[in-house]
Swiss-Prot record:
<feature type="modified residue" description="Phosphoserine">
    <location>
        <position position="287"/>
    </location>
</feature>
<feature type="compositionally biased region" description="Polar residues">
    <location>
        <begin position="218"/>
        <end position="229"/>
    </location>
</feature>
<feature type="region of interest" description="N-LIP">
    <location>
        <begin position="1"/>
        <end position="108"/>
    </location>
</feature>
<dbReference type="GO" id="GO:0005737">
    <property type="term" value="C:cytoplasm"/>
</dbReference>
<feature type="short sequence motif" description="DXDXT motif">
    <location>
        <begin position="712"/>
        <end position="716"/>
    </location>
</feature>
<feature type="modified residue" description="Phosphoserine">
    <location>
        <position position="923"/>
    </location>
</feature>
<feature type="modified residue" description="Phosphoserine">
    <location>
        <position position="472"/>
    </location>
</feature>
<dbReference type="GO" id="GO:0005783">
    <property type="term" value="C:endoplasmic reticulum"/>
</dbReference>
<keyword id="KW-0496">Mitochondrion</keyword>
<feature type="short sequence motif" description="LXXIL motif">
    <location>
        <begin position="723"/>
        <end position="727"/>
    </location>
</feature>
<dbReference type="InterPro" id="IPR007651">
    <property type="entry name" value="Lipin_N"/>
</dbReference>
<dbReference type="GO" id="GO:0005667">
    <property type="term" value="C:transcription regulator complex"/>
</dbReference>
<dbReference type="InterPro" id="IPR036412">
    <property type="entry name" value="HAD-like_sf"/>
</dbReference>
<dbReference type="GO" id="GO:0006642">
    <property type="term" value="P:triglyceride mobilization"/>
</dbReference>
<feature type="compositionally biased region" description="Basic residues">
    <location>
        <begin position="152"/>
        <end position="161"/>
    </location>
</feature>
<dbReference type="Pfam" id="PF04571">
    <property type="entry name" value="Lipin_N"/>
</dbReference>
<dbReference type="GO" id="GO:0009062">
    <property type="term" value="P:fatty acid catabolic process"/>
</dbReference>
């Protein structure tokens, strides 16, 4: 019985440890990276697929992933998305590059964020001190006003109670409309916990695990039930949070909650959150990525997360935009009780000085969620909305009465409820627009460049085709933009507006106006009746906000349609020099859009969105019933007139956009100082309570002319697919006999090994440990990159074990690896598998059929071109030099062509002369 008890205990402990390794909440992994040195010395790499589990980065200090290679830190960093994926941030200044929404992101912050926050704090304190004593006592921290701290505390408590009652009533009414809204619950420790900007860490919080100064970390509330844990890049991820009830809350409750959007660092300050939403948005576990709730009552669909090789995770698209449009027409939508408002930043610098903070308070920034539903509206609805909104300039619109603002903006903001969370750094009164104008110019220059594209506006609010990725509505919230979820309308919104007209004027000295273009616009029916219209010399093609002739526009449109990306800027300029007509020796427009102007349309039908020249319907973007349009001017004189007169104000514009990428450039790879062969790499994320979460992998530096052997794992190294996952973890040797010796001898002949399996990325550490564990009398498997599927655990297991279709992943992965070896078109010399699907995958990437081997559970090895020849790993090991000839000749006396010139062919005796007796007799 003692033996039985010990055996049961050992099995229990083993299964428990196995569950810890497979628990989706703690599942982290890294796929090995392959770097290929090209003939010209440049480097190319496979994608950096790194994923952190939920518990490992539950309360991350920043969403910054540090990288160590061979024990030394490198100057490159990755950023962490809300699905746990890590990615690099690539800066681009191509104003015509089309960046999908799920690839847009904000830059990785440096010390500039801390400097800006300190500047904003100083401005806020100075403003509070200038107020009357009662207001100052209410806004200052308790440490500054000890005598009036209790009074301000009681007032804040009454505010929260009133806000709680409103939110509870709204929650009962709209519970079916938005299940992610949660009411605020008050804590019994409200009177003992200071609810302002001066937060302190609790005594039981362990110290940080690194040497980073604590002032760079966001402070943590001492409130035991509603502590806030800000996430990275000063971006507070969307969480179930309270929204100010703009129709029921008195004006004084809405004051001081104006959120300020800082374009280049996405710094956000949000309203106070509920206890249930006090944590930041954390990476989704593998089970959550697959097992989405299907009983949603809202129009939004929580779709399965697709994570393909070489790409970032994005939601599957199942519903068409037209169905969304028909299901919820804008005109028949009932105005809900709770509203979110979006603060629109005008490019005109005088707007900030003309607005008073009182008129702008109460406007919550419109922050996107991880899965955003875009509302499509037709032009008739837009006309009706535009007619209802009185035409007025931007500054006058901001001074409009508050209820009117709520009414005009609610119709389009209500479908996409946003979740905001208030910053703990700015006290009780938030941040004002004056904080931006009073900021130190040196600090402001880090975030608000003076020139560039109008990126601070939503994409649909402008007619131009330029994309400023870091300034999209999803980017300002950080979490939404890094969540990896692509909106179902991205396929429409990412394409630039294209229109054609017979207005002419490209070769004249006059400029092409929008009215003139629309006057001669060509409809679809006209173009269908007369396709030869493209030969008309007066034809003008409008791509975004730029005008071309057909000869110039044709390659641009072809590249966008075929490759979903624009031509390089140098190529476009070369085409324009050859094909575009000249205007008085000067180009007809400035390529970089330096002469872009902002025109405020006063017509009601143009207050909301443009129409008539867009080929597809675009989602309506309303901002205080004001439509700010960007049109391209074509003269330097207009550009000079459009410059703001005052240079002291800040311009929220930038022509630099940021996008996610999983690959590094050749220069970045060279900066890693990799050595030939394997290089250990560690990806780490610092957390406030769990310390540092690490994810280990290997970077392999190979040459373009190396020969690679592909090997499957499940069923090829192990004896079966299913038991190969379980039995080795329990300590049972479930490996084919002789495979370690065979692979070792093949590697000694100069071949590289690549282990490719359709297992999930979360099983990387377990699989890598198994490959290191295989040992046959002192002989181990050769080192090689481990390539796994970046998809979730359960989807990978379902594809590998249940569907038995691993070729879906393998073909995509191996094709990408093969392309890295160019100009070597056949880098894969041989391959080992166990199923017909493996044979199909290997044939697709160019492996010769006579060097594809499959093994069955009995250990019988079959060569595909001669299936009757049944062998084994042990027998193949005996003739390894014939099947896998030696590549490294330094220790060999054989000639390169061993079948023609070798020791045997040189020393063998010549054949005796042979005479054909029949021929001799016939001749006689």
């Amino acid at each position: 019985m003692n033996y039985v008890g010990q055996l049961a205990g050992q099995v229990f402990v083993t299964v428990k440890e196995l569950y810890k390794g497979l628990n989706p909440a703690t599942l982290s992994g890294c796929i090995d990276i392959i770097v290929i040195r090209q003939p010209n010395g440049s480097l190319q790499c496979s994608p950096f697929h790194v994923r952190f589990g939920k518990m490992g980065v539950l309360r991350s200090r920043e969403k910054v992933v540090d990288i160590e290679i061979n024990g030394e830190s490198v100057d490159l960093h990755m950023k962490l998305g809300d699905n746990g994926e890590a990615f690099f941030v690539q800066e681009t200044d191509n104003d015509q590059e089309i960046i999908p929404m799920y690839l847009a992101t904000s830059p990785i912050l440096s010390e500039g964020a801390a400097r800006m926050e300190s500047q904003l704090k100083r401005n806020s304190v100075d403003r509070i001190r200038c107020l009357d004593p009662t207001t100052a006592a209410q806004g200052l921290p308790p440490s500054d006003t000890p005598s009036t701290g209790s009074l301000g505390k009681k007032r804040r408590k009454r505010r929260r109670k009133a806000q709680l009652d409103n939110l509870k009533r709204d929650d009962n009414v709209n519970s079916s409309e938005d299940e992610d809204m949660f009411p605020i619950e008050m804590s019994s420790d409200e009177d003992t916990a200071p609810m302002d900007g001066s937060r302190t860490l609790p005594n039981d919080v362990p110290p940080f695990q690194d040497d980073i100064p604590k002032e760079n970390f966001p402070s943590i509330s001492t409130h035991p039930q509603s502590a806030s844990y800000p996430s990275s890049d000063r971006e507070w991820s969307p969480s179930p949070s309270s929204l100010v009830d703009c129709q029921r809350t008195p004006p004084h409750l809405a004051e001081g909650v104006l959120s300020s959007s800082c374009p280049l660092q996405s710094c956000h300050f949000h309203a106070s959150e509920s206890p249930s939403g006090s944590r930041p948005s954390t990476p989704k576990s593998d089970s959550e990525l697959v097992s989405k709730s299907a009983d949603r009552l809202t129009p939004k669909n929580n779709l399965e997360m697709l994570w393909l090789w070489g790409e970032l995770p994005q939601a599957a698209k199942s519903s068409s935009p037209h169905k969304m449009k028909e299901s919820s027409p804008l005109g028949s939508r009932k105005t809900p009780d709770k509203m979110n408002f979006q603060a629109i930043h005008s490019e005109s610098s005088d707007t900030f000085s003309d607005q008073s903070p009182t008129m702008a308070r109460g406007l919550l920034i419109h922050q996107s969620k991880a899965q955003t539903e875009m509302q499509f509206v037709n032009e008739e609805d837009l006309e009706s909305l535009g007619a209802a909104a009185p035409p007025s300039p931007v500054a006058e619109e901001l001074k409009a009465p508050y209820p009117n603002t709520a009414q005009s903006s609610s119709k389009t903001d209500s479908p996409s409820r946003k979740k905001d969370k208030r910053s703990r750094h700015l006290g009780a009164d938030g941040v004002y627009l004056d904080d931006l104008t009073d900021m130190d110019p040196e600090v402001a220059a880090l975030y608000f460049p003076k020139n560039g594209d109008p990126g601070g506006l939503p994409k649909q609010a402008s007619d131009n085709g330029a994309r400023s990725a870091n300034q999209s509505p999803q980017s300002v919230g950080g979490s939404g933009i890094d969540s990896g979820v692509e909106s179902t309308s991205d396929s429409l919104r990412d394409l630039p507006s294209i229109a054609i007209s017979l207005c002419g004027g490209l070769s004249d000295h006059r400029e092409i106006t929008k009215d003139a273009f629309l006057e001669q616009a060509v409809s679809y029916q006209q173009f269908a009746d007369n396709p030869a219209i493209i030969d008309d010399p007066n034809l003008v093609v409008k791509v975004g906000n730029k005008y071309y002739n057909w000869t110039t526009a044709a390659p641009l449109l072809l590249a966008m349609q075929a490759f979903q990306k624009p031509l390089p800027k140098a190529t476009v300029e070369s085409i324009m020099r050859d094909k575009m007509p000249k205007k008085g020796g000067r180009w007809w427009f400035s390529w970089r859009g330096r002469n872009a102007t902002i025109k405020e349309e006063s017509k009601p039908e143009q207050c909301l969105t443009g129409k008539g020249h867009n080929t597809g319907e675009q989602p309506a973007q309303l901002g205080l019933a004001t439509r700010i349009k960007h049109e391209s001017s074509s003269s330097d004189e207009e550009h000079a007139a459009a410059k703001p007169s005052g240079s002291s104000h800040l311009s929220l514009l930038s022509n630099v956009s940021y996008k996610k990428t999983l690959r590094l450039t050749s220069e970045q790879l060279k900066s890693l100082k990799l050595k030939n062969g394997p290089n250990d790499v560690v990806f780490s994320v610092t957390t406030q309570y769990q310390g540092t979460c690490r994810c280990e992998g290997t970077i392999y530096l190979w040459n373009w002319d190396d020969k690679v052997i592909i090997s499957d794992i499940d069923g090829t190294i192990t004896r079966s697919d299913t038991l190969g996952h379980i039995l080795p973890t329990l300590g049972k040797d479930w490996t084919h006999q002789g495979i370690a010796k065979l692979y070792h001898k093949v590697s000694q002949n100069g071949y590289k090994f690549l282990y490719c399996s359709a297992r999930a990325i979360g099983m990387a550490d377990m699989t890598r440990g198994y490959l290191h564990w295989v040992n046959e009398r002192g002989t181990v498997l050769p080192q090689g990159p481990l390539l796994l599927s970046p998809s979730s655990l359960f989807s990978a297991l379902h594809r590998e074990v249940i569907e038995k279709k691993p070729e879906k992943f393998k073909v995509q992965c191996l094709t990408d690896i093969k392309n890295l070896f160019f100009p070597n078109t056949e880098p894969f010399y041989a391959a080992f598998g166990n199923r017909p699907a493996d044979v199909y995958s290997y044939k697709q990437v160019g492996v010769s059929l006579n060097r594809i081997f499959t093994v069955n559970p009995k250990g019988e090895l079959v060569q595909e071109h001669a299936k009757t020849n049944i062998s084994s790993y042990v027998r193949l090991c005996e003739v390894v030099d014939h099947v896998f000839p030696l590549l490294k000749r330094s220790h060999s006396c054989d000639f390169p062509c061993s079948d023609t010139f070798s020791n045997f062919t040189f020393w063998r005796e010549p054949l005796p002369p042979f005479e054909n007796q029949d021929m001799h007799s016939a001749s006689a």
